Amino acid sequence: MIENLQPLRGMKDLLPNDYQIHNYIINKARDVGALYGYKQMSTPILEYTKVFNRSMGESSDVMSKEIYSFVDKSNNAVALRPEFTSGIIRSFISNGLQHKLPLKFFSTGPVFRYDRPQAGRQRQFHQLNYEYLGAKGAITDAETVKLAVDILKALEIEEDTTLELNSLGCHESRIVYQQKLVEYLNDFKDQLSGESRLRLNKNPMRILDSKSEIDQKIIAHAPILSEYHTNESKKYFDELQKYLDILGIKYSVNPRLVRGLDYYCHTVFEFTTKKLGSQSTILAGGRYDMLSRIMGNYDVHAIGFAAGIERIALMREYKISVIKPVFVLPIGKNNICYALDIVDKLRLQNIVSIIDPIGKIAKRIQRVLNEDAKFIIFIGDEEKMNNNLKFKDLKNQKEYIIDFEKVLELLKQ
């Protein structure tokens, strides 16, 4: 026997009750996305590491500290996906979908990051992911935010979230701002946290995300990104806000909200909550017009977002209605074949049915009661001989000796 046989740290089993909640969340989100024209697709969990290196940059936190990567038996550098977007764009390029724009993709599944496990943050977790490729103009940003709002409403958590948004401006204005930010932060270099000092030359905009109290005091007086926007960028953000106002979407502009990856531009947004402590982000997204250029030399306007399923599940207690199975208990080996035939007929009628032929009848009945079932069908010698069934309603404790057609009537009431 292997001692202490447990899952890896930060990775959890999804038992049936958890899976029911996950499936409920996924199905709700998928249905809302379908109303917007999103079609489900899937990419491999494992990709060449260069897919993420190229998209996220080797100096990003994900690639430098959080990526699960290794060399396989064919000497290929591969990685477990830390997010969906890079794989979706890789798929878009490798499948030659450039001439089929616009495209709207929904994906879901596990992602992996080597992070410090805590409530709402695991090393393997699951996401809902939406990508809109060929999304031109602020109107598509507004529609994407509205989709996110509608998903949170369908999941009954929208009222417990706050929407924050910001504009990163165009690529040119971002470069100018980054230079100004570095100039400002260099004056406080010795006071910054160790992590922020490392980011200063590699990815300075990520410092704006720092949770360090020392960093926060310095950041509070840093240059504001919007002060370096071009007129075109200002017009774009104004137009987005106009559309959101028309749609009746409540939001606040957070000038410190950024993305540390170079391919982001213009709109970024987050839905946060106060119900989950430090892990406050429920859903986050933004526009990434530069990514397809970085990965494949294509210019594709795009916007998307992702939401953590585990965090959504922590937001409220979802009560999932579960179809109770009918248990069929044959009494004696001679009646097992007849019981199998009855179970098969029930399943053909889309009735969830379980046969339990082994063990003492008292123990089998107890197993049924433990499952909180509603009905039992007993099949003994007399029932088999008369082509009947003993049907017991566990709610009112009534028993009936009836034929199969009458059983169907009672089950379908």
UniProtKB/Swiss-Prot annotation:
CDD domains in alphabetical order: HisRS-like_core, HisRS_anticodon
Keyword list, A-Z: Aminoacyl-tRNA synthetase, ATP-binding, Cytoplasm, Ligase, Nucleotide-binding, Protein biosynthesis
Catalysed reactions, semicolon-separated: tRNA(His) + L-histidine + ATP = L-histidyl-tRNA(His) + AMP + diphosphate + H(+)
SUPFAM superfamilies: Class II aaRS ABD-related (SSF52954), Class II aaRS and biotin synthetases (SSF55681)
Cellular component, GO annotation: cytoplasm
HAMAP family cross-referenced by the UniProt entry: His_tRNA_synth (MF_00127)
Database matches in PANTHER family: HISTIDINE--TRNA LIGASE, MITOCHONDRIAL-RELATED, HISTIDYL-TRNA SYNTHETASE
Record family assignment: Belongs to the class-II aminoacyl-tRNA synthetase family.
UniProt protein name: Histidine--tRNA ligase
Gene: hisS
